[in-house]
Each structure stands twice: as C-alpha cells, then as structure tokens.
Amino acid sequence: MMRSRPLLYLLALLVGVLSGCSAPYVQIGDFRDTEALQREELVQRGLSFLGSRNISDHNSVRRNDCSGFVVGVYRSLDFRVELEHYNTRFVADNLYRNLRSKGHVYYGMRPRKADLAFFRYTVPNGGNRVTHVGMVTEVENDDTVVIVHYSSQGVSLMRMNLQNPHEHRNESGEVINDFLRKKTPDTRPNSLLSGELFFMYGDLYRYLTD
C-alpha cells in the first residue's frame, strides 16, 4: 500500500493541473440570459425613439426610413450590421433577403423581442417585394404583437394580431391591427391592416450573432 501512494499523488496532481487549464463551465442558460438581456436592451433603445421624425441625427441611424430605423437600433448597441446587396429597389426587401439567405426568417411561431416583422403591399407598385419592416417589442396575452417602426408619422407603435388579421378592433374596442396602408382605388381587397399585410418574421439578432 505504501508503494501506491506516490502514484496516487501523481494522479491527483495531474487532475489538478488539467482542471486549472480548462475553461470554466458555463451553462447554456447563461447564454440565453445574456441574449434575453440584449434583446430587451434593443427593445428599450427602439422605444426611446418614439415620437421622433428625424432619427438620422443619431450617429447609428443612416436613413429616416423603416429599415434605417431597425438597423440603426442594432448599430446603436454596437452590433455590426453588414448586409449583402441584392437586386431590389426596397431596402426592407434587401434586409429580408439577407436574413432569408442564412435561414433566419420564419412564420407561424411566436416572435421574440427584437425580432423583425416584414410586410408586403404597403405601398403602390411594390409588387410582391417586402416594402416595410418593424421591430417586435412584446407579445400581449391575446397574441397581439406590438411593433415599433418608422413610418410617415415618425417612430411609433403598431399592433398586429394574426389570429384576427381582418379586425381593426376587438370586442372591447381595443386596437389589435393598425392601419398600415391608406385605401386607394388600386388597393387590393383586405390589404389595409397590419395583420393583412404581414409577410414574415426575421431574427436579426441571431443573424448577427450566429
């Protein structure tokens, strides 16, 4: 038994050295907590622009439009947003195509905070291209999605309920789908409300961090 003690000592020493050189164990939940905090920061930054029309004065926002707003929110928190340029005249459509190219667009699932909501047919002569984009701030108990976006009125909130896309208000009189397009002679049927014009969600956060 005395002869085995040096061997046991060497084994214990080796285990100690290897343990000291290994990286600290981090649970997956820690990463998720960090992501949740960053997503909340993005939402709060987006909400801080509410009521603003000229947002291009902020050094992270390059254009006073819907895509310039959402990209600027991410850039303001030091996310490096680099996008490929596709053959499309709508910047929101270009943003959508970038996310789609990496598999970060989805439909039919509950959106996460700071995810993007893409819309089509919000302007005349837009074809089937994405023409508008906003950022999800929360999902209410009735599945109404609250979105902060930049429009002709500046930065504001709109609501969208895909369970009842053709209803402007619910039975209690609360708005569940905001008007996103004005009615004109060439407006398609059922193409005025946010729920009617919604196309796809996009995860810009994961696109930038994966």
Go through the PLM ranges and name each one.
Residues 1-9:
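Bacterial N-terminal signal peptides that target proteins for export
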Residues 22-88, 100, 188-210:
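N-terminal capping segments
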Residues 30-31, 127-210:
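Aromatic- and glycine-rich peptidoglycan recognition patches
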